Curated annotation (Swiss-Prot):
It comes from the Eukaryota. SUPFAM superfamilies: Ribosomal protein S2. One of its GO terms (cellular component) is mitochondrial small ribosomal subunit. The keyword Ribosomal protein applies. Gene3D superfamilies: Glucose-6-phosphate isomerase like protein, domain 1 (3.40.50.10490), Helix hairpin bin (1.10.287.610). It is found in: Plastid. The gene is rps2. Belongs to the universal ribosomal protein uS2 family. It comes from Aneura mirabilis. This is Small ribosomal subunit protein uS2c.
Length: 239
């Protein structure tokens, strides 16, 4: 796919508060190239840099989607949890919006087995098998199913490791980033002024705390994924 602008406008980014970083005393010096200035002891992110890296991330996402690649969106902080579900659902991506369990990717064979058990339990419930079990077994099965839904609901149909992982908060999801690095899975990550931009493939300098900022950027990324998938379908129809 050809590169495009993705309708990234500085005014919209300012309205979403994407430029507000953390307090100066909390900064990571590696973020210096992405900081415009400081105001009232708070770093202000250079939105020109945000636009540049977000555009690059959208290009990557669209190209990958056009080739049938699979995405995993990770955001477990309370400000992001529901936004992650909405963004992932709209773009048909897998997601994790509760606790990241260690080994989610690096111990994939075990996770895959648990996902199969999850799918089987749901089939049994739908088939009415739970109704024929003793009360204690029903309670145990419901409890297991509830826990599986909480932690694995967003990856229930993920049958292989993702090709690209999109991460909302680098510091919060550092275990996920380490697993991606170990496995060589490319990452796109929002990086606030207290983050390390060098541990992700495409860092997007941005406020990773404000809901408006998270929503605006995740919408751009998932829009690019959707456009890539549409392009893939058009190519299939024309071939």
């Amino acid at each position: 796919m050809k590169q495009k602008s993705w309708d990234i406008h500085l005014e919209e980014m300012m309205e979403a508060g994407i430029h507000f970083g953390h307090q100066v005393r909390k900064w990571n010096p590696k973020m210096a190239p992405f900081i415009f200035t400081e105001r009232k002891s708070v770093h202000i992110i250079n939105l020109t840099q945000t636009a540049r890296f977000l555009s690059e991330a959208c290009d990557l996402a669209a190209n990958a989607a056009s080739r049938g690649k699979q995405f995993l969106i990770v955001g477990t902080k309370y400000q992001a949890a529901d936004l992650v579900v909405s963004a992932a659902s709209g773009a048909r991506c897998h997601y994790i919006n509760q606790k990241w369990l260690g080994g989610m990717l690096t111990n994939w064979s075990t996770i895959e087995t648990r996902l199969q058990k999850f799918r089987n339990l749901e089939k049994e419930k739908l088939a009415g098998i739970f109704e024929r079990l003793p009360k204690k077994e029903v309670a145990d099965s419901e409890r297991r199913l509830s826990r599986l839904r909480k932690y694995f609901g967003g990856i229930k149909y993920m049958t292989a490791l993702p090709d690209i992982v999109i991460i909302i908060d680098q510091r919060k999801e550092f275990t996920a980033i380490r697993e991606c690095i170990t496995l060589g899975i490319p990452t796109i990550c929002l990086v606030d002024t207290d983050c390390d931009p060098n541990v992700t493939d495409i860092p997007i300098p941005a406020n990773d705390d404000a809901r408006a900022s998270i929503k605006w950027i995740s919408n751009k990324l998932t829009l690019a994924i959707c456009e890539g998938r549409l392009n893939s379908n058009a190519n299939c129809m024309n071939s």
